[in-house]
Structures are given as structure tokens and as C-alpha cells.
Amino acid sequence: MLIAKLLLVVIVSYLLGSIPFGYLVSHRGSKIDIRSYGSGRTGATNVLRTMGRKAALLVAALDVVKGVSAVAFAGLVIGTEALTFGTNGMAILFAQVLAGLAAVAGHIWPVFLKFRGGRGVATFFGGMIALCPVAAIFGGEVLIIGAGLSGFASLGSITGVVGAYALLIPLTFISGFPTEYIVYAVLGSLLITIMHRDNIKRLLAGKERKLNEKSR
């Protein structure tokens, strides 16, 4: 029964993550396909460059909600059922980590857009908000400062997710926070960094676009 619930959590969380808010907002607001502009991604950064700040903030908020909703859904589905090799708390956290990662995967590879979406940053932070708000807040601050000082959204995103992971190291091994949090942060930050590999190449080559550059 628990395996069936975990499977349900993963499928629903993936579908939640697959909701292409960047595509929907741009198509409804300006009748355009955001994938035909700029980076071709559906995330808030490309929406910012294409449609402006208000649309980008809306998309970012909705993408965050996807992560929060997936983690919350996992908690509701698992309820008080326990894993055979652990406690009830472990069962819930394990399911929530799976849910958060599935939502991030859905955002990156959305079934509704032929598996072509964003890079998963906002949805990752949504999951982190639901799991460990203090790490999410710290990582978000690092993201904003990094992007603001450098002018590169990609650099801010990478440093932000890594910052959340870095804070969880002492929180886990010194303060006793659940290890599931750091598992989510490690896997999520690794996936997001991989999704930014082209940006990293452009950063090293000095060819990465600034945050305020408009898409064409």
C-alpha cells in the first residue's frame, strides 16, 4: 500500500511540476510561445527578458507554488503510514523529498510541452520552502545577491541552490536537522547545475547574457 502511495506521490508531483506557467502566462498575455524567444526555456528569467518584470514575478511565484504543493501533497497522502525500515517521520520526509524532486523534474521536462521546460530553480526553492524554510530563505538571499551583483541570472541561480545546500551541512551534522533535507538539496542542486551547463560555458567564455538583456 505504501509503495502505491509513493508512486501516486511521484506521478502527481511530476504532473504538478509539468504545468508550464511560463508558457501559459506568455501565451495568454502576449499570444506568444515563450520557447521561441531567448533561451527557449519557460522559466521566469526568459519571461523577464521577453515580457517584463510583472509577468516574470507571476511565473516565478507560480513555479514556487508547484514545489510547495508537491511536498504538501506528499505529506497528506502518506499520512501516518510508516516505512517498514524506518519510522513514520522517515516515511513522510522520504515521500516529500521524492515529491519535490519529481516536481523539479516535471518543470524541467514537462510532459505537456514535449519535455521542454525551464531549469527548475523556482520549483526547487518551492520544495525547499516546504521542507526547510530557513535553508530556502538563505539560498534565496544568495540567489538575489549573486544575480544582483554579477548581473547574471544563471550565476545567481547556481550560487543560490548551492547556498541552500551549504547551509544544510552544519544544520544537518551539527544541529541535527533531518538528513532528508540535505539529500533533497544535493540532488536538486546537482540537477539544476547540470541544467545550467551551457550557461556555465558561456560564463567562462565571457559570452553569457546579462539579466537585463532583452530576448529576441
Curated annotation (Swiss-Prot):
Residue runs in coiled coils: none
Keywords, ordered alphabetically: Cell membrane, Lipid biosynthesis, Lipid metabolism, Membrane, Phospholipid biosynthesis, Phospholipid metabolism, Transferase, Transmembrane, Transmembrane helix
Enzyme category, top tier: transferase
GO molecular function: acyl-phosphate glycerol-3-phosphate acyltransferase activity
One BP annotation, GO: phospholipid biosynthetic process
Pfam families documented for this protein: G3P_acyltransf
Catalysed reactions, as listed in the record: an acyl phosphate + sn-glycerol 3-phosphate = a 1-acyl-sn-glycero-3-phosphate + phosphate
GO cellular component terms attached to this protein's record: plasma membrane
Protein family according to the UniProt entry: Belongs to the PlsY family.
NCBIfam families assigned to the protein according to its UniProt record, in alphabetical order: glycerol-3-phosphate 1-O-acyltransferase PlsY
Identification of the protein by name: Glycerol-3-phosphate acyltransferase 3
Record organism: Dehalococcoides mccartyi (strain ATCC BAA-2266 / KCTC 15142 / 195)
Organism classification: Bacteria, Bacillati, Chloroflexota, Dehalococcoidia, Dehalococcoidales
Gene giving rise to this polypeptide: plsY3
